[in-house]
């Protein structure tokens, strides 16, 4: 029985084809050529199309921050809500995200804290595609030239792609401001998620191929906490396409 779905989108969302890495199964949906350049109607239309593929899932982990608006009233949706509400409280926040996240001011779902939004599609694309840190630095330098970070207590990475480069962002911003917290939507998910060991973890993922490193990090995260033993593999069940 499939009991968990992880929903994510990115540069791509069409075909649901499979990529195998690190003992995990990936389902890559390749529709949008560039991340963050689509509107709410396009996002909702695509989710509705995909939803039938994971309609039997008992829980849907929503890693795509732009999809939260669609899933926020679903009893099956999980996106680290409790952790986000706790960690975003009483802080002046700079939110780095997609154009849609900025337009909808998505963080208002989780906090009354003052939030400034910055649309960073080039950073999200770079993070998703795993570009080198020196290229990420060049992009950041362009975005944040003459930027005053002194009024912020937190920089929120509103993208699972940006989360992949979290260590880079910690180092980058540490050189520009003495003390600032870096937190992402994926941090909230990892903080709230309760891992239950089974012989096989019957999960399946809707992700972009370039985000495969996240699942390696998720596996490392579980090992460090003793939830996944040294020689135990984090496996996912196969999802077969029907009528596609």
Give residue spans per PLM region.
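Non-catalytic structural scaffold of enzyme domains
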Residues: 1-244
């Amino acid at each position: 029985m499939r009991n968990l779905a992880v929903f994510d989108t990115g540069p791509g969302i069409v075909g649901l084809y499979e990529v195998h890495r690190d003992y995990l199964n990936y389902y890559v949906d390749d529709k949008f050529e560039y991340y963050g350049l689509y509107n709410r109607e396009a996002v909702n239309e695509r989710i509705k199309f995909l939803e039938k593929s994971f309609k039997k899932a008992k829980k849907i982990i929503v890693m795509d921050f732009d999809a939260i608006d669609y899933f926020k009233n679903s009893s099956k949706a999980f996106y680290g809500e409790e952790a986000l509400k706790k960690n975003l409280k009483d802080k002046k926040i700079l939110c780095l995200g997609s154009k849609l996240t900025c337009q909808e001011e998505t963080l208002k779902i989780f906090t009354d804290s003052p939030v400034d939004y910055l649309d960073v599609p080039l950073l999200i694309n770079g993070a998703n595609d795993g570009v080198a840190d020196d290229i990420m630095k060049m992009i950041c330098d362009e975005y944040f030239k003459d930027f005053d970070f002194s009024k912020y207590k937190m920089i929120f990475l509103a993208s699972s792609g940006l989360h992949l480069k979290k260590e880079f962002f910690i180092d980058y911003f540490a050189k520009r401001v003495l003390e600032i917290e870096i937190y992402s939507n994926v941090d909230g998910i990892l903080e709230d998620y309760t891992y239950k060991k089974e012989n096989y973890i019957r999960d399946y993922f809707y992700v972009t191929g370039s985000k495969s490193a996240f699942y390696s990090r998720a596996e490392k995260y579980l090992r460090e906490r003793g939830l996944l033993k040294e020689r135990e593999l984090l496996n996912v069940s196969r999802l077969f396409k029907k009528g596609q």
